């Protein structure tokens, strides 16, 4: 079973990105001073970059978890330790 942290991190990052884009899509730029617009778009860019980095980190962690699980299950059964498997959340 895939740990819930991977799914949670991905969902939080996607929620932040989508909510930021939804909030910005309703703003009329003509009514706001230039500095505020630049500040707002800077915040949107920062939020999207952080969300993208979070998704990439969660994806790399998921790949690492799959590789560790594959390497552990490839060993001969007599060398498998149940406590290590529970610690790594493999079984």
Swiss-Prot record:
Signal peptide: 1-22
Keyword Transmembrane: yes
Function: Down-regulates the EGF receptor.
Pfam families on file: Adeno_E3B
GO cellular component terms attached to this protein's record: host cell endoplasmic reticulum membrane; membrane
Membrane topology designation: Single-pass type I membrane protein
Localization (cell): Host endoplasmic reticulum membrane
Sequence ranges on the Cytoplasmic membrane side: 61-91
Protein's name in the database: Early E3B 10.4 kDa protein
Superkingdom assignment: Viruses
Family, as annotated: Belongs to the adenoviridae E3B family.
TM region(s), chain numbering: 35-60
The keyword Signal is annotated on this UniProt entry: yes
Keyword terms of this UniProt record: Early protein, Host endoplasmic reticulum, Host membrane, Membrane, Signal, Transmembrane, Transmembrane helix
Organism: Human adenovirus C serotype 5
InterPro entries on file: Adeno_E3B
Lumenal side: 23-34
